[in-house]
Amino acid sequence: MLTLDGVPFTSVPLKINTSEKEYVDVASLDVDGMVADLLKYKGKSGTACPGPGEWIEAFEDAEYVFCVTITSNLSGSYNAACVAKDEYEKAHPGRKVYIVDSLSAGSEMWLLVEKLRELIQADLSFDEICQKIATYNQHTHMVFSLESIQNLANNGRVNPAIAKIVGLLGIRMVGIAEDGRLAQKDKSRGEKRAISDVMKNMKEQGYAGGKVLIHNCQNEAAANSLKEQLLAMYPGANIRIGKTRGLCSFYAEKGGLMVGFEDGQA
């Protein structure tokens, strides 16, 4: 069990599979090495979600458990966690598990995890935490900018016809997490335009200077540029930069940005 600033915390990893190797999305994964491998790999690849047993193992002996899962519309993780919840609560009367379907991924999920930490440390009741995190989930969003979406297309997450366009002549796909699915909003030519379109889509979803987490896949320069431009408009905003982990690096691919943020009502 890990800790998140004093709160017991662990992750239940998904897996990235090729015919040559399996990559488990844990903190020790060499993400840069995985990205380099996948750039050279020409065969089929895919992902696998954790099963109920892996969730139950992660619950350990906790009285109260809060889970945040990747969107149920793109992964079986949420359903597996629900099965685990039912089995765990049946086996341990009085213990409770609450599952948050993020309807998103990556940086937006991390906003939810950080909010849960805040609520737990405020010593609220289980039911109060459930209510407040459900409300907060309605006011977090994600915008992304991708230089390549081949892995998304290969795994049925986006239209293959769109994948053929993205990457040609410097075109990037800018989109949002909408109702738990990836929705294309712009085809942006060049990184400068893509960053501008990311900011435009953030404003359209109600961004007004709240917390922002910018996760990048080997593109820290773009992440810093976005942060600087946001701070120019919203001085003092809490904006942090991080790196995508295994699963998000697989789908965002080299050069990708995933931007999780709070709207003005969070």
Please provide the spans of the model-predicted regions:
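Conserved phosphate-coordination/catalytic loops
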Residues: 45-53, 189-193
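A short helix->loop->beta-strand "cap" motif at the edges of active sites that frequently abuts
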Residues: 94-95
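Active-site cofactor/cluster-binding pocket
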Residues: 50-85, 89-91
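A glycine-rich beta-strand to alpha-helix segment
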Residues: 69, 98-99
